[in-house]
A protein has these predicted regions:
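Conserved G1/Walker A P-loop phosphate-binding module
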Residues: 1-114, 130-132, 142-143, 148
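Short, glycine/charged-enriched secondary-structure capping and boundary segments
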Residues: 22, 84-87, 116-119, 218-222, ...
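Flexible beta-alpha connector loops of hexameric P-loop NTPases
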Residues: 77-84, 118-133, 152-158, 212-213, ...
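General secondary-structure edge motif
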Residues: 35, 75, 109, 121, ...
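Conserved nucleotide-binding/hydrolysis micro-motifs of P-loop NTPases
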Residues: 25, 51-52, 75-78, 106-112, ...
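Glycine-rich, flexible loop/turn motifs
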Residues: 26-34, 41-43, 51-54, 83, ...
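Amphipathic alpha-helical transducer elements in NTP-driven molecular machines
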Residues: 35, 49-52, 65-71, 85-99, ...
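C-terminal-of-GTPase-core extension/linker across diverse P-loop GTPases
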Residues: 2-8, 13, 19, 147-354, ...
Length: 365
């Protein structure tokens, strides 16, 4: 099951530098001119989780396999993208294929790095991109409402639901609000997601600050934090320059560097976890002598569907899941001890998997 987060931003905000650090590569050409990223660069990154190596140590696992997320560095956007200006059409098509948006905002002053509008204002930058996404959605909604007219005449239930949801989104957008702020009933949630509107995607604001502000943020990132809180969005503070340096160091050197900078952990780790949380994801583990592995599932997933992430046969032939909570596994010293202590539970098809569960599935082949 793949989860994809698109990294977006105006030209020269540091998003390609950030992508390079995330993926530990120089894949994205981080040049000081608009549109240096034309084709989206795609990178698969490990989700940091201190629980996994602890489980592996207890089980003496020969291999450790973390959960992963996909990040996509998408072409720099400019005002007018919804009308096809700059690389607008390509940008909008690429972002439509992602599950969430990491919006990099320039919160640093640097005379050597040009700003597309000539001055630094992260709130205005955020509004530029949000406006372009909203305009694109409005255009898309108008087209779709026209195309479903015939189905509506025939009383098609799906078309009736789609029209209702499209009009709900249209009302939000015409009021100047992104569609993700609309109140959608649980019964409509799947159909709402299927609309694939750009402004329904959850947003994480990434405040790219100067190196000296990486630990505490600055006045510009504080403004972004207020904006995010008002929108019910998430935000992280990060220095792409620092992360780029850390990406070139080994683990020991990186730890020393972070300590010198007054940072408890790499900003990228916080960014990845924030993206994971934004997408409503959680982790369960399978642990044994061969491997300890983290598996990604949406929150609220039931045991058979969680098993299906490993293999479809596990879901189809699901019998039960032997379950140990992470804290019990660690405090008691492994599967056998947890079982002896009565801390291993047998869960059926209705069980909602919890974050950190250590699971062993039994199924009919």
């Amino acid at each position: 099951m793949g989860f994809k987060m698109g990294i977006v931003g105006l030209p020269n905000v540091g998003k390609s530098t950030l992508f390079n650090a995330l993926t530990r590569t120089a894949a994205a050409q981080a040049a000081n001119f608009p549109f240096c990223t034309i084709e989206p660069n795609v990178g698969d990154v490990a989700v940091p989780d201190t629980r996994l190596p602890r489980l592996a140590g207890i089980a003496k696992s020969r291999q450790v396999i973390p959960a992963r997320m996909t990040f996509v560095d998408i072409a720099g956007l400019v005002q007018g993208a919804s009308r096809g200006e700059g690389l607008g059409n390509q940008f909008l098509a690429n972002i439509r294929e992602t599950d969430a948006i990491a919006h990099v905002l320039r919160c640093f002053e640097d005379g050597d790095v040009t700003h597309v509008d000539g001055h630094v204002d992260p709130i205005a930058d955020a509004e530029v991109i949000e406006t372009e996404l909203m305009l694109s959605d409005l255009e898309s909604i108008e087209r779709r409402l026209q195309t479903i007219t015939r189905k509506l005449r025939g009383g098609d239930k799906e078309a009736i639901q789609q029209e209702r949801l499209l009009k709900l989104a249209q009302e939000m957008l015409e009021a100047g609000k992104p569609a993700r702020l609309a109140e959608v009933a649980d019964d409509d949630r799947k159909a709402w997601t299927m609309l694939q509107l750009l402004t329904t995607k959850p947003v994480l604001y990434v405040c790219n600050v100067e190196e000296g502000a990486a630990a505490t943020g600055n006045a510009q990132s504080a403004r972004v934090a207020e904006m995010a809180a008002a929108q019910g969005a998430a935000h992280v503070v990060i220095s792409a320059r620092i992360e780029e340096e850390i990406a070139q160091l080994d683990a020991e050197e990186a730890a020393l560097f972070l300590d010198e900078m007054g940072l408890e952990e790499a900003g990228l780790d916080r960014l990845i976890r924030a993206g994971y949380d934004l997408l409503g994801l959680q982790t369960y583990f399978t642990v044994g002598p061969k491997e300890a592995r983290a598996w990604t599932i949406p929150r609220g997933t039931r045991a058979p569907q969680a098993a299906g992430v490993i293999h479809g046969d596990f879901e189809r032939g699901f019998i039960r899941a032997e379950t140990i909570a992470y804290d019990d596994y660690v405090s008691l010293g492994g599967e056998a001890a947890a079982k002896d202590a009565g801390r291993m539970r047998v869960e059926g098809k209705g069980y909602e998997v919890k974050d950190g569960d250590v699971l062993h599935f039994l199924f009919n082949a």
